[in-house]
């Protein structure tokens, strides 16, 4: 009994996702269409990056890199800004979920190395917002952008120009938050970094490059995943054992929930009518309940106003924990590193995210 309770506490979000999937499965009984719910590429990329990040942790890569960042910058405020900006840039290049999987461990090691763990929740929240909003600028910055870019055949120049104003506002807001909420306290290393295993680190960085190449479709995702898995079986089986499999299952259950929601006639009819009133506003609201990727797929069937829809499903990625499934990655990482503090984190997460959501929604309403 105690073991079950402990498991539920540790994997609360996964259990909620499972319940949501099971409940909606009574409304939409399982059939062959369920197989189309899953974004197999996303799941493969998540597994690949999680596995490689675990391997890099095992050779102290992030710890040594964090030590170098601490030595480079004179105070914790600058370190925080750098971490958030790196996540911003990373989300534009390798997508929001991959950026978080890569740079959240770096954020942890920077703060831990500097002895500034009290800024952990704030830094993770800002990195999360940066990942969700930084990806809006490019078609491959997040899954919903890639889907809408392909469905509506949006010219790349038009796409970038449409998303540039809210992107610049997001950059400004996050930078201001870092300046206000993080004091310019001097920092120094608590421990002397160990020497890095160059050969193993080089091999794991090569595997990380393979994981990123999968995102850009240079090789089929299943080939990349198999190659990474087999390599780690030989080089570091502990990395495969350390993969956060409950996080992967959380995504699976949410895919089922969102897919079922999109097939319920009452919900489909509702969205069809409200989108005629205000596509931007209702796409933002939709994201808060069924996440931004399912919202983009569902709502694109009922509107041709791709500009408003594009804005809505991007800024709608902030707000609730399920507004963007990438936020579940951050929650899971924080809960693992800071057990027992999840409630406080969710409260801070909600306060910052809804503040950003209100400001960005009001701004985008002026653009459309």
Regions found by a protein language model. Give the residues of each.
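Membrane-core helix-loop-helix motifs of multi-pass transport proteins
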Residues: 115-183, 188-190, 332-360
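Structural signal for alpha-helical transmembrane segments and their membrane-water exit/capping regions
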Residues: 2-33, 45-60, 181-183, 210-238, ...
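Transmembrane helical segments that form the transport core of multi-pass membrane transport proteins
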Residues: 37, 59, 63-66, 207-304
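C-terminal transmembrane helix pair
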Residues: 160-171, 281-368
């Amino acid at each position: 009994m105690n073991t079950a309770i402990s498991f539920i506490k540790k994997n609360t979000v996964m259990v909620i996702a499972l319940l949501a999937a099971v409940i909606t499965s009574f409304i939409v009984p399982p059939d062959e269409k369920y197989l189309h719910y899953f974004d197999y590429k996303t799941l493969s990329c998540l597994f690949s990056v999680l596995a490689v990040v675990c391997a890099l942790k095992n050779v102290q890569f992030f710890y040594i890199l964090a030590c170098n960042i601490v030595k480079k910058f004179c105070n914790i405020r600058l370190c925080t800004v750098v971490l958030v900006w790196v996540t911003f840039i990373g989300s534009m290049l390798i997508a929001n979920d991959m950026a978080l999987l890569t740079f959240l461990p770096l954020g942890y090691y920077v703060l831990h190395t500097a002895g500034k763990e009290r800024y952990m929740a704030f830094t993770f929240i800002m990195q999360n917002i940066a990942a969700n909003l930084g990806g809006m600028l490019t078609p491959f910055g997040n899954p919903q952008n890639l889907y809408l870019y392909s469905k509506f055949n949006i010219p790349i120049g038009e796409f970038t120009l449409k998303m540039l104003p809210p992107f610049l506002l997001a950059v400004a807001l996050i930078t201001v938050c870092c300046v206000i909420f993080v004091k310019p306290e001097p920092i120094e290393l608590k421990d002397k970094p160990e020497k890095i295993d160059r050969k193993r680190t080089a091999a794991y960085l090569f595997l990380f490059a393979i994981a990123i190449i999968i995102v850009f479709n240079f090789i089929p995702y299943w080939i990349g995943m198999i190659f990474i898995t087999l390599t780690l079986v030989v080089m570091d089986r502990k990395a495969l054992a350390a993969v956060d499999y409950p996080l992967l299952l959380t995504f699976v259950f949410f895919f089922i929930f969102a897919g079922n929601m999109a097939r319920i006639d009452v919900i489909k009819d509702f969205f069809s009518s409200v989108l005629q009133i205000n596509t931007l506003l209702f796409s933002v609201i939709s994201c808060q309940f069924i996440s931004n990727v399912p919202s983009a797929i569902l709502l694109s069937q009922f509107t041709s106003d791709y500009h408003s829809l594009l804005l809505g499903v991007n800024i709608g990625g902030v707000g609730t924990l399920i507004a963007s499934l990438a936020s579940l990655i951050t929650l899971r990482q924080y809960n693992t590193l800071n057990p027992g503090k999840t409630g406080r984190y969710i409260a801070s997460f909600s306060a910052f995210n809804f503040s950003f959501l209100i400001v960005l929604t009001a701004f985008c309403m002026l653009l459309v």
